[in-house]
From Swiss-Prot:
GO MF annotation: an example: DNA binding
UniProt keyword list: Chloroplast, DNA-directed RNA polymerase, Magnesium, Metal-binding, Nucleotidyltransferase, Plastid, Transcription, Transferase, Zinc
Note on how the cofactor is bound: Binds 1 Mg(2+) ion per subunit.
UniProt-listed Enzyme Commission number(s): 2.7.7.6
InterPro entries to which the protein is assigned, alphabetical: DNA-dir_RpoC_beta_prime, RNA_pol_asu, RNA_pol_N, RNA_pol_Rpb1_1, RNA_pol_Rpb1_3, RNA_pol_Rpb1_3_sf, RNA_pol_Rpb1_clamp_domain, RNApol_RpoC1
Protein name per Swiss-Prot or TrEMBL: DNA-directed RNA polymerase subunit beta'
Enzyme class: transferase
Record's subcellular location: Plastid, Chloroplast
Length: 696
């Protein structure tokens, strides 16, 4: 129910009275007639394919199929021989056809205008009988099996008529000694056509019996009695000693608690219990149960139409039986058949509301069960979760995530086919501004052609538009972060592995949603607050949340590992070589560039040991030992010397000053050290910038 009187709209799902259903469904035409009741089970005319009058698609009830065109296919102001429109001078009748009685309004009215079916007998709502918990048995205090037998006319109950004692309810009259005499008195009523009157007065079954029982309930008295009984059972529970008696009392207490909660809700919501029995069945608007004409004879329609047709046909048959019951020739056997027709009507309404819980679910020609009203609104594909709560959002997409090791922390790889759809309006505007396309149609043609220059322009367009990546469930703020998109040719989203901790994601098939912020405020918020490289610490503990993953740690280990060789292989042997430190197995390099050139030329491997000349101005060597003792000290004839340690060597001149330092390392360690140096250098430049005000 949408409350249009208040500023904020709300959706409320509750039980309504038959009067409210009639108020929603009935419409007063300009000629004073009331329409809204659906009596014809037909949908479309088989020859003209037009809606049948008073049928499930009637234009008098639900509005015109075409905007401003009546069933006669005439627009306002046109004349047709044989009839005339209502006087156009009268404003109230200007949009009404006098002949077909169809209002000439917008066809969108067929999306929300309802109808109703007046049931020949009351029908109990299946949701309140067969579902758990079952509310109708809870209220009337009967077993669920007994209530089901009563609803489906397998059980009769005696009830008072007009608050007066009946024959079967006189206390003390039906005793064992006078039972034969009573059978003789009642037999003429049961075996003749007087049974109809006898049944209406003395017996009740079906939805009518449930309705009478619920109508006679006083909720406040029932609440008081239930509470008093619960207190009495609470005292008896402490007295009883056997476990069997305690279990019996506990079961009754649980039943009373359920009843008290439900009765309190009914009183608070001002709902009458008898509203759980239907007298008027609402008919959904036609646009919510569409029908499509695919050919001359082939028609595709919603399953709800088939279920509505079954209800209308059985309701019509029951009405005919009621009209014939006053006939003396109407035999008792046919009256039994009328009771059977009540059960058929109950089953038809059950199938419409919840086909899965009905006795025999209705099936189509391919033995597939029809989708009932419960199936339409329930589940992930239902009306609520698919259209109201979690409907698909514009400018959004979804795909599988894979690792992107070459991406920066604030970047993500966006598939080209997804990006060209998400940024199509921005791309069209850019093409028109550049003069590449004269209009929107030409721009769309270029985009559909996938010209090579389109991808370059698209990448420029994406520079000013960050995207939001979200992985469900979004449990904290790190579940949705902003990234700068980079075009990739694959169909998967590429993601930096360090940000997966915040998303609680891995690369085993997880999917993530992409959203494009549109407004200036959303783009600014994405850049200032939601970018991944600005969300590095957990707000709860202050610990880093963007940390290297196991794959990255394993890669760093492989990168910095070296071959375990003894240090004696790199000692100075003057008898074997003229070179001081290097040999064929351990080459010597003077700087980083020489190492990288040799690695590209495949003269050295990633983990091969080598000697690298270290910059003396950078200071000493950091070791794991505070004061490392040299393994060997070599003195030259010219006064120079060199000290050989475990991982480095130091050359000194005649004055004892350090002239050269050589460190024992690998290509992988040099690569790792260079990246660390670049990171510290960029960070120091950022701190030295006058626009930066760091807070520590």
């Amino acid at each position: 129910m949408i409350d249009s009187k208040k500023k904020h709209q709300k959706l409320k799902i509750t039980l309504v009275s038959p009067e409210q259903i009639r108020a929603w469904s009935e419409t007063i035409l300009p000629n004073g007639k009331r329409v809204g009741e659906v009596t014809n089970p037909d949908t479309l005319d088989p020859t003209t394919k037009k809606p049948q009058r008073d049928g499930l698609y009637c234009e008098r009830i639900f509005g015109p199929v075409k905007s401003g065109v009546c069933a006669c296919e005439k627009k306002p102001g046109q004349k047709k021989k044989g009839f005339a429109f209502v006087d156009r001078k009268k404003k109230k009748d200007s949009n009404f056809c006098k002949y077909c009685e169809v209002e000439l309004v917008d066809s969108r009215i067929r999306r929300y205008r309802m109808g109703y079916i007046k049931l020949a007998c009351p029908v109990a709502h299946i949701w309140y009988i067969k579902r758990v918990p079952s509310y109708i048995p809870t209220l009337i205090g009967k077993k669920k099996s007994e209530v089901i037998d009563l609803v489906y006319c397998n059980l009769f109950i005696t009830r008072p008529a007009a608050n007066r004692p009946t024959i079967l309810r006189f206390r003390g009259l039906l005793q064992d000694e006078n039972l034969p005499s009573w059978i003789g008195i009642l037999f003429p009523y049961i075996s003749s056509w007087n049974f109809v009157e006898f049944q209406e007065r003395e017996l009740a079954t079906g939805g009518n019996a449930i309705q009478k029982r619920l109508t006679g309930l006083d909720l406040r008295i029932l609440l008081t009695h239930s509470y008093m009984e619960w207190k009495k059972l609470l005292r008896n529970y402490k007295i009883q000693r056997t476990q069997r008696e305690k279990n019996k009392i506990q079961k009754r207490k649980n039943f009373l608690v359920r009843r008290i909660k439900f009765v309190k809700y009914l009183i608070q919501a001002k709902i009458k219990p008898e509203w759980m029995v239907l007298c008027l069945l609402p008919v959904l608007p036609p646009e919510l149960r569409p029908i499509f004409v695919l050919g001359e004879q082939i028609i595709a329609e919603s399953d709800l139409n088939k279920l509505y047709q079954k209800v209308l046909i059985r309701n019509k048959n029951l009405q005919s039986s009621f009209e014939m019951q006053g006939d003396p020739l109407y035999s008792t056997g046919k009256r039994d058949f009328m009771t059977f027709q009540k059960r058929l009507l109950q089953e038809a309404v059950d199938a419409l509301l919840d086909n899965d819980r009905s006795g025999e679910p209705g099936e189509d020609l391919f033995n597939r069960p029809y989708k009932s009203f419960s199936d339409v609104i329930a589940g992930k594909e239902g009306r609520f979760r698919a259209n109201l709560l979690g409907k698909r959002v514009d400018y959004s997409g979804r795909s599988v995530i894979v690792v992107g090791p070459s991406l920066a922390l604030h970047q993500c790889g966006l598939p080209r086919e997804m990006a060209i759809k998400l940024f199509q309006p921005f791309l069209i505007r850019n093409l028109i501004r550049r003069g590449v396309a004269p209009n929107i149609r030409a721009a769309k043609s270029l985009i559909q052609g996938r010209k090579p220059f389109i991808w370059k322009i698209l990448q420029r367009v994406m520079l000013g538009h960050p995207v939001l990546l979200n992985r469900a469930p979004t449990l904290h703020k790190f579940g949705i972060l902003a990234f700068q998109p980079i075009l990739v040719k694959e169909h998967a989203i590429r993601l930096h592995p360090s940000v997966c901790t915040g998303f609680n994601a891995d690369f085993d098939g997880d999917q993530m949603a992409v959203h494009v912020p549109l407004s200036i405020e959303a783009i600014l918020e994405s850049r200032l607050l939601m970018f991944s490289h600005t969300n590095l610490l957990s707000p709860s503990s202050g610990s880093p949340i963007t940390i290297p993953t196991q794959d990255m740690l394993l890669g760093l280990y492989i990168l910095t590992a070296d071959k375990n060789q003894d240090i004696s292989e790199f000692r100075y042997h003057p008898s074997k070589s003229k070179k001081k430190i290097s040999s064929k197995k351990n080459p010597c390099f003077s700087n980083y560039d020489d190492v990288f050139i040799a690695y590209q030329q495949k003269r050295v491997q990633l983990n091969s040991p080598l000697w690298l000349r270290w910059r003396v101005a950078d200071g000493g060597i950091l070791t794991s030992v505070d004061r490392e003792v040299p393994i060997e000290i070599q003195h030259e004839p010219f006064g120079t010397s060199q000290e050989i340690y475990e991982h480095y060597a130091i050359q000194k001149n005649r004055m004892g000053k350090i002239s050269n330092i050589y460190i024992r390392t690998t290509v992988g360690r040099i690569l790792f050290n260079r990246e660390i140096e670049k990171a510290f250098l960029s960070f120091s430049k950022l701190l030295e910038s006058p626009q930066t005000n760091p807070v520590f």
